[in-house]
Amino acid sequence: MINFSSFYQQIADSNLQHWLETLPAILGKWQREHKHGNLPKWEKVLNKLHYPSPDSVDLVDSVTIGTGEQLTPGEKEKLENLLRLFMPWRKGPFHIHGIHIDTEWRSDWKWDRVKPHISPLQNRTVLDVGCGSGYHMWRMLGAGAKRVVGIDPSPLFLCQFEAVKRLSGENHPVHLLPLGIEELPPLDAFDTVFSMGVLYHRRSPIDHLLQLRDQLRMGGELVLETLVIDGDENAVLVPQDRYGKMNNVWFIPSVAALMLWLKKCDFTDIRCVDTDVTALAEQRRTDWMPNESLVEYLDPKDITKTVEGYPAPKRATIIAVKNQPNQDLS
């Protein structure tokens, strides 16, 4: 069973210590009641990941753990077979003991677009909401963050993250908790909060923005990356059914509308730092994620549209700062 006690110990003397009033009970309940059919199998695989500490770890330019020279060909093959039991791998890529986990998403491209615009992460306490398997968390740590906490309710993402962490050798200050943001109390403690690829999955985007605000300290920075459409501050796409074959897409605003929402939620210094149409090379089928991907979600006759006829995925990154609220929006 995955143990969260080291996280409790690390935050006991930090500005997150008041979280300990509720978090152990919430995670204890999750461990008792979570019934995902594959979780016991994945935990058994995790228990087989007994490998020497890597001879090197690079989190600055990539997520590379080990050079591959420490393992025999047989050991390397065994490790790759174990890691493949956690398929599909969606966010990455990872390089582990010479094994290239070629994930569906080139998450390093997104990081390269975002990183130049954010406040330096040196010595910051960071929250990554909807962190997936944790790729960006490792890059945040490589950028100098003091502590990185990710939340994502998916048990597969949790196990993928735990696999990478166990193979990294050290007890790095990076932790993934199997929670949704609605399970977090208002912590008012993080220096930077990331929400990337989450907003359009939320039934109430304004509530999501308020929940993000509640996790930031006063003056803390929000990094929000999400799908957008073209248009003015009144433009919002509400898909009738599916968007890009996804049945959990609720609201896709224009950049202007999104900035207005943030202003209404008492954020300041709001600025759009990047817009980017998702390229077929950034999200694609791979040997580690053999299912449908972006090319199947687009109109084969016109890739500027989804199969449903909506504009193809376009993403924007917005940065904003938590301000003293003028009124109680919660």
From Swiss-Prot:
GO terms for biological process: tRNA wobble uridine modification. It catalyses: carboxy-S-adenosyl-L-methionine + 5-hydroxyuridine(34) in tRNA = 5-carboxymethoxyuridine(34) in tRNA + S-adenosyl-L-homocysteine + H(+). SUPFAM superfamilies: S-adenosyl-L-methionine-dependent methyltransferases. Its EC number is 2.5.1.-. Keywords: Transferase, tRNA processing. InterPro entries: CmoB, Mo5U34_MeTrfas-like, SAM-dependent_MTases_sf. Carboxy-S-adenosyl-L-methionine binds at residues 91, 105, 110, 130, 152-154, 181-182, 196, 200, 315. One of its GO terms (molecular function) is methyltransferase activity. Belongs to the class I-like SAM-binding methyltransferase superfamily. CmoB family. HAMAP family: tRNA_carboxymethyltr_CmoB (MF_01590). Homotetramer. Catalyzes carboxymethyl transfer from carboxy-S-adenosyl-L-methionine (Cx-SAM) to 5-hydroxyuridine (ho5U) to form 5-carboxymethoxyuridine (cmo5U) at position 34 in tRNAs. This is tRNA U34 carboxymethyltransferase. It comes from Shewanella oneidensis (strain ATCC 700550 / JCM 31522 / CIP 106686 / LMG 19005 / NCIMB 14063 / MR-1). The lineage of its organism: Bacteria, Pseudomonadati, Pseudomonadota, Gammaproteobacteria, Alteromonadales.
